């Protein structure tokens, strides 16, 4: 019988953390965070990181493991999560993976393709060629070597277009060919849950309410301190997190406070929409309604 692992996924502001803490207090499980914002130290308010009181109730693994100046890939997450899962199981407990970064969940379940590392010289050659010939011409090149990727990647998406060409020039194989290679299935009985409100308006209201609370908790001061470090900028993955980018731009004088709030809430709602799009096509998923009384009982039944 394979060891059991629980996934609790859902859009932002759907109540994942509260339900996970309830389960941690009522069952012999440990929480692993699956969130690309919670990994960063010093980004507490805007990422809705669990409070000290909540962490005392249910410690979370894989939070505060990177400085905001550092990158962290899906491959990094997969390696770290597999190590944490194995350790929790050795302790005789059930791993509970909680979060909304769907790419991390997907990487953990399916593995990652063995793509070559970036090559700065080849990338520079591609950029120089694009400067002379234009990205449309390079897109035609991609269509010749990898029509599937060319259909998926728009000519106006130079980052992904460049990467697809770079992979081919390094390996001699197309991105499509390489991404068909998957890892072996996880050696666990993975039970997957998603939680979300039944009505979209409820989620939208929760998102707006939570951002207002973040502002009351000192979110602008948090971003001000990050900005004052001098080594962070908006091109870093950490500063692309929703809320942080909009607040940074407000502090730069790009728009006023009310516009910042409007843009941050809109960006968060767009994130939630993308998360729900992922989840609607997710196989073998058990749905829970945010705030429903029977959620804890349902989760505990699957823990046995």
UniProtKB/Swiss-Prot annotation:
It comes from Shewanella putrefaciens (strain CN-32 / ATCC BAA-453). The gene is miaA. Its cofactor is Mg(2+). Keywords: ATP-binding, Magnesium, Nucleotide-binding, Transferase, tRNA processing. GO terms for molecular function: ATP binding; tRNA dimethylallyltransferase activity. Its EC number is 2.5.1.75. InterPro entries: Dimethylallyltransferase (IPR039657), IPT (IPR018022), P-loop_NTPase (IPR027417). Transmembrane segments: none annotated. Coiled coil: none annotated. Belongs to the IPP transferase family. It is an enzyme of class 2 (transferase). This is tRNA dimethylallyltransferase. The record marks 101, 123 as: Interaction with substrate tRNA. It catalyses: adenosine(37) in tRNA + dimethylallyl diphosphate = N(6)-dimethylallyladenosine(37) in tRNA + diphosphate. HAMAP family: IPP_trans. ATP binds at residues 10-17.
């Amino acid at each position: 019988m394979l060891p059991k692992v629980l996934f609790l996924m859902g859009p932002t502001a759907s109540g994942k953390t509260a339900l996970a803490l309830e389960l941690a207090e009522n069952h012999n499980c440990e929480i692993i965070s699956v969130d690309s914002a919670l990994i960063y130290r010093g980004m507490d308010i805007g990422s809705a990181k669990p409070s000290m009181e909540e962490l005392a109730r249910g410690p979370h693994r894989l939070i505060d493991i990177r400085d905001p100046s550092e990158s962290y890939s899906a491959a990094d997450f997969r390696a770290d999560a597999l190590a944490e899962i194995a350790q929790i199981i050795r302790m005789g407990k059930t791993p509970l993976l909680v979060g909304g970064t769907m790419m991390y969940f997907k990487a953990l379940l399916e593995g990652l393709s063995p793509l070559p590392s970036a090559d700065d010289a080849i990338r520079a050659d591609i950029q120089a060629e694009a400067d002379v010939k234009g990205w449309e011409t390079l897109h035609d090149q991609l269509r010749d070597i990898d029509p599937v990727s060319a259909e998926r990647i728009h000519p106006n998406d130079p980052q992904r277009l460049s990467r697809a060409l770079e992979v081919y020039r390094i390996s001699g194989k197309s991105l499509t060919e390489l991404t068909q290679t998957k890892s072996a299935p996880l050696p666990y009985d993975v039970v997957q849950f998603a939680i979300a409100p039944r009505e979209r308006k409820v989620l939208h209201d929760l998102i707006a309410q939570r951002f207002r609370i973040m502002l009351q908790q000192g979110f602008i001061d948090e971003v001000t301190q990050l900005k004052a470090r001098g080594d962070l900028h908006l091109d870093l993955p950490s500063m692309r997190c929703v809320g942080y980018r909009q607040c940074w731009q407000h502090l730069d004088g790009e728009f006023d406070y009310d516009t910042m709030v409007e843009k941050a809430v809109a960006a968060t709602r767009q994130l939630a929409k993308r998360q729900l799009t992922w989840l609607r096509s997710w196989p073998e998923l058990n749905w829970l309604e945010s705030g429903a009384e029977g959620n804890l009982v349902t989760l505990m039944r699957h823990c046995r």
